[in-house]
Structure formats: C-alpha cells, structure tokens
Amino acid sequence: MSNSNIDNDLDKIDSLLKKAKSKKIPVTYDDINNALPLNKNPSIRQLEEAILKFSDAGVDILESNEDDEIKLDIGMDEEFKLSTNVDNEPEDEVEEENIGTTDDPVRLYLKDMGGVDLLTREHEVEIAKRIEEGHKTMIASLCRSPIAMRCFIVWYEDLVNEKMLLRDLIDLEANMLHDETPENDEENSSETEGEEHEDNHLSMSRVETQILPNIIERMKKIAFICEELLIEAKKCYEKSFEPKVLQNSKKYNNLELLINEVSEIHFNSKRTEEILGKMYGINRDLINKETAFLKLAEKYGVTRQNFLDEYIGSVINAAWKEKMLKNKKVAWKELMTKESDYIDQMIAELSVIESKTGLLVNDFKKLVNTIQKSERQTLQAKKDMIEANLRLVISIAKKYANRGLQFLDLIQEGNIGLMKAVDKFEYRRGYKFSTYATWWIRQAITRAIADQARTIRIPVHMIETINKILRTSRQMLNELGYEPTATEIANRLSMPLDKVRKVMKIAKEPISLENPVGDDSDGGQLGDFIEDKNAVAPIDAAIQSNLREVTTRVLATLTPREERVLRMRFGIGMNTDHTLEEVGQQFKVTRERIRQIESKALRKLQHPIRSKKLNSFRSGGKRGDGNSSDLLEA
C-alpha cells in the first residue's frame, strides 16, 4: 500500500473521530468498519487501534442496531448524517460489493456478526421458551428410562455416604443466582470486579451448606419413587411384551411426580451427560447390530423397504422368528433357515439390551430419538440467542483492553460467559437478557485476565487482595496528596504489615529485558543497562591492566634472576605462587639462598625511584591483580 493510501485511510479515521467529538455523538462499529480500507485486508492491530482510539478520546461506541441509538454513518464523500433507529432493525447495511474480499478473521467475524438482527424482548422470551421446552422434553424422556432411575438411586446413596460432593451433583451457580438479579451498573462493576471471585467462592460454599439437607430430602424422595417404578417396570416386562401394560399401570402415575422433582433439582451437565452417554452407547450398539442384520438380509434378496416393514415395530423374539419362517416370500424363508443360529444369537443379544434398558427395543429407540430431537431443538435455540448477542460481548470486551490479553482473546472469553448466561437465563424474571448476560460476560473476562494476563500466574485470591490494596492506595493518594506508605495502607485495611508488603512486592509486573529503550532503533535494549554482577567492572579492568604493565616495567629493572624469583614466589604472570623449596629446585639452590635473593629484590623495589610508581595502586586496595597486590603489600 502506498503512503498516500495509508494517509487517506488514517484521514478517514481521524475525520470520523473529529466530527464525532465536535458533535458529541457516539459512533457504531459499522462506522469504524466503513472508515477502514474497504478493498484491503486491515490487520487485527489496525482494528484494535481504531477501536481504542475512539475509546481513549471519550467517544462512545454503540451497537449497530441498539434501541433509540443515534447512528453516525460515513460515506465515500465523508458527509455525516444522523438517523434514529427505534425498530431495532439495521438500516444502512454495507453493500456486498463494498466489503471486498478479505481473509482477516476479525473483519469476517464482525461482518458475520453484523448480519444477525438484535432481539426484542418478545423474541428473547420466545427463544427462552424454546430452550425451556426442549429441556423439559429431555428431562421427561430421561425420567422414563430405567437407566436414569438407577442412576438417581446411585447418586442418592453416594451423596448420603459422602462419596459425592453436592457441587458434583447439582448446578450450584443456578441455585446461588436463583434469588439474585444482576444489575448492569458500570460504575459499581468497576469498583467490585476485584472482589467477584472471592465473594462467589464464599457464596457457593454457603449455598452448598444451606441447601444440602433439602437436596438430600429431595433425592431420597426421588430414589423411593424410582425403586417403585423399577419394580413395576420389571413386573410388566416379565408378564407381557406390550408396552401399553406399563404405561397403564397405576404406579406408573408416579412418573409425573418424578419428572417434577428432577426438574426442581437442576442436575449439572456432567450428571445429565452421564445418563445420556449410557443411553447413546447402547443405542449405537443396537444400530450396529440392526445394520449388520439388514446387510445380511439384503444378501438373501430381501429388499430394504421390505426389511423395514417386517422389522421396525416388531418385537424380535422366537415368536417373530416362527412368523418369518411362514412368510410367503422365499427370501425371508431362506434367511431364517440358513441363518438360524445368527438369528437366535441376535434375539439373545436384543434380549440382553432389553433387560439392561428395562424397555422393549422399539420403545428404547423411540425414547432416544425423542431425547436427541429435544437436544437439537435446545441447541438451535441457544445458538440463536448467542449469535444475536455477540455485539454485547464486544461492547464489554473493549472496556478491558490493554490489561494483558489480546482483544480477540477478550472476545472469546466473553463469548464463553455469554454461553453460560444463555444456560442460566430465566425469562420469567422480567429483565432483558442483555442485563443478565452482562454480569456473566464481565465475570468471564475478568477471570481470564486474572488467570492468563500475567507472565507468572498469581492465584485468584491473591489477585483480589492486590486489587483491594491498589484501590485503597489510589483513594489514599487522592486524600493525602502523596503516595501512602505500606504502614498507612495496612492501618486502613486492618491488614498485617508483612502481608501488605508481600502483596505489593508480588504486584510488580515482570518486564522483558529485550524491551527497546528510547524511540530510536539504536537505543538498545533494557538488558543493556542492567549491571552484570559476575562481569569485571570497567574501572577494575583498567586498573588491573595498568598495574600489570607497571609491575612488568618495575621488575624489568631487577636482574633476571631476581625478577624470576619474585614472579615465581608471588605468582605474577603465572597460575599460582611457589614455595621456597619449589623455587630452589627450579634454580638448583637451597631454600635459604632463594630467601636471600627474594629479600634483596624486595629491598630494591622499596627504593623511592621504583616504589613511587607502585604507590598509586596501594590506595585502590586490592581491586587489581591479586598477585601484584601481594607484591605491593610485601
């Protein structure tokens, strides 16, 4: 891209920002998107910088289709116009040809997100009812399965015997938030976001303790109903293969009571998936057996449609085999005759499945199909609710920019919170979904920042303590006019002084030694300015080098023998010093003679002509060469 094009793109952003500030009106994401280069591929950094530029300037960024929003649109001629959108419908959609081809993930994400209409209160209620209806259908279907009944009994026994925690059985958060209505109060959120996790942890523990007796009582009732239903189901299964017998049983009327009790408990997703996993596993095994039987029948000339007509809806047992042996079609007779052992084995395997599920094969398949259909209905409704509120995630995520996570990571974490909000939303409360979801999105983002933003992870409870101390420090700075000391902060928070100092030390952010210093490329890196304790200081290296040179010149004024003796005795220019005995062996003289030569040489060095050259190094102590320093002391 040429410099002129870059300047033109920057001019569009600056022009949009300038006019928005002068008119004191907000902009939308579409306005920023349109101001970016259309037929280019703007990077993620460019998009983030554009959004942050408006946010730092104090210009509000609104959604494209928000109630009663004032929309600022910029065209190619850069003329601005005001319009009010009250019908929650997108007005000035970007033309497809203007978007251009792009493979930038952020641009594509915003484009797809902008194509989904926002929901009115009525639409939110409609989707929430679809989710609720799908969930109710699934719960009702699960309660009709003896597999689920056995699971309920086992869970009750594990809970009573303390083999299972309550939080592993039910959704504690749903119970904890059952009586709370989160407010979308930005001012309060900024003050309390630092204490969310600690309060939530305490609240969940408190809720778990409070509701445990009630849950045990409910589970006891559920287990009792399930035991009665299992006994009745077994009797009906043994007496007759007609499913209507079980349905018409008087004790089976307890099924509605079981459904109501299970719906009130709110089992968590893991427990529901445990039951579904067992049922789906049996269903897959059943499908594999039926598929193998169909392929075998086709080898004998039985058409697929004829096989389905005779197999589907029939109770596969010995009576069915006798019936098919009398079938008028030769293919069936041949199949039943030649594959008699295979048919008997399949009947036995189906009988095992029926005893395991407590239902006839056809009834079990219908039950699984009903559950799968309700799951698809629920997932589609949740998908619609999530896609319609993705703009809300971006509007919240931009407030947490520059806190250690990339903008895209903030969006993804916010989306996770949005999905949790969809699962917990109760439309009967009367408030809009966006009001409820804001709390979940903000919690997901703040938790992600606490867990992932730092290079060295700090536990969440310590993060909250750090935030509390930093918040108190800012308040005291405004009150006192100077930075408060650790003692003053400890007194204000009634916290031990050692703990405050420890937390303030932990709060320091790590910094890379490769960070550039200055604006110039030649400014170097931060690591260049950190002292290396193991390296020789430049002044010490200079003194050592100078001392070595002076010592060499002074020793050169002695006789070669005297110089050699002193060098060996003090280790000057050598790896180590030598004893009198070792030097004597080198010169083949006695120790006493070496001592005399050494004494004579030292007296010569003490002469003012020689000593004045070395005295200047004595003031520096032993910063220079250790061996040369020993010579100075001598």
UniProtKB/Swiss-Prot annotation:
Taxonomic lineage is: Bacteria, Pseudomonadati, Pseudomonadota, Alphaproteobacteria, Rickettsiales
Its assembly, as annotated, is: Interacts transiently with the RNA polymerase catalytic core.
Chain positions covered by the region annotation Sigma-70 factor domain-4: 554-607
Query: In the record, what terms sit under GO molecular function?
Result: DNA binding; sigma factor activity
**Organism of origin:** Rickettsia conorii (strain ATCC VR-613 / Malish 7)
Q: Where is this region: Sigma-70 factor domain-2?
A: 385-455
Subcellular location per the Swiss-Prot or TrEMBL entry? Cytoplasm
What segment(s) does the record annotate as region Disordered? 177-202, 608-634
Its GO biological process terms? DNA-templated transcription initiation
Q: Could you tell me which residues form the DNA-binding region?
A: 580-599
What GO cellular component term, any one, is given? Answer: cytoplasm
InterPro entries documented for this protein: RNA_pol_sigma-70_dom (IPR014284), RNA_pol_sigma70 (IPR000943), RNA_pol_sigma70_r1_2 (IPR009042), RNA_pol_sigma70_r2 (IPR007627), RNA_pol_sigma70_r3 (IPR007624), RNA_pol_sigma70_r4 (IPR007630), RNA_pol_sigma_70_non-ess (IPR007631), RNA_pol_sigma_70_r1_1 (IPR007127)
Q: Which Pfam families match?
A: Sigma70_ner, Sigma70_r1_1, Sigma70_r1_2, Sigma70_r2, Sigma70_r3, Sigma70_r4
Q: What does this protein do?
A: Sigma factors are initiation factors that promote the attachment of RNA polymerase to specific initiation sites and are then released. This sigma factor is the primary sigma factor during exponential growth.
The family note in this entry says: Belongs to the sigma-70 factor family. RpoD/SigA subfamily.
UniProt KW keywords = Cytoplasm, DNA-binding, Sigma factor, Transcription, Transcription regulation
Acidic residues biased stretches: 182-197
Q: Per the record's keyword annotation, is Transcription included, yes or no?
A: yes
Annotated protein name in UniProt:
RNA polymerase sigma factor RpoD
Indicate which residues form the motif Interaction with polymerase core subunit RpoC: 409-412
Fetch the Gene3D superfamilies from UniProt.
RNA Polymerase Primary Sigma Factor, Sigma-70 factor, region 1.1, Winged helix-like DNA-binding domain superfamily/Winged helix DNA-binding domain
PANTHER family listed in its UniProt record: RNA POLYMERASE SIGMA FACTOR RPO, RNA POLYMERASE SIGMA FACTOR RPOD
Q: Where do the record's region annotations for Sigma-70 factor domain-3 lie?
A: 464-541
